[in-house]
Regions:
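Bacterial N-terminal signal peptides that target proteins for export
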Residues: 2-13
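N-terminal presequence-like segments and the immediate start of the first folded domain
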Residues: 12-88, 92-105, 112-161
């Protein structure tokens, strides 16, 4: 009888270890891989990465464009204030889906009447949110956005755990 009990314990331990392994692999597979090939210009000083590799089988969420409106819907006429608020709104949207900034695979930003003078504000805000784990990013200059006082909008593709 003791021999049978040991065999059952050993079988149970093997089953437990086998079922635990895929979970450990899945958890590590949800991490994004940031890629900046040495054969290309280093984009990180400008606040983005060249590419982001999403693990196979990952769940993906798409966050709609977040503008610079505060919680009352008011927009500052100041570009820098709108950018800062838009990233705060993106942070709130990430929180709302249980995600973190390091899970953002790609950003698309829309800038009204873009010129080079705006790059510093854009870079400072993206680095404040993402640190050195900068997602891939595309900047699209536009003549206007959904509401006339809007000067900036950011949307995100997020890989969920």
């Amino acid at each position: 009888m003791p021999h049978t009990a040991i065999r059952h314990l050993r079988t149970g331990a093997i089953i437990a270890m086998t079922t635990a392994l895929p979970l450990a692999v899945q958890a590590s597979e949800t991490r994004l891989e940031i890629v900046n090939p040495r054969t290309l210009h280093d984009p990180t000083p400008n606040g983005y990465s060249t590419a982001t590799i999403v693990p196979a089988g990952a769940r993906v969420a798409y966050i709609s464009g977040q503008g610079g409106q505060d919680h009352t819907g008011s927009l500052s006429p100041d570009f820098a204030a709108q950018v800062k608020q838009a990233y705060a709104n993106l942070g709130a949207a990430l929180d709302g889906i249980g995600a973190r900034p390091d899970q953002v695979a790609k950003l698309t930003i829309y800038v009204v009447d873009h010129d080079m003078s705006k790059l510093g504000v854009l870079t400072d805000n993206v680095k404040a949110m993402f640190g050195d784990r900068l997602p891939a990013q595309t900047l699209v200059p536009v003549p206007k956005l959904a509401v006339d006082p809007m000067l900036f909008e950011v949307e995100a593709i997020v890989v969920l755990d």
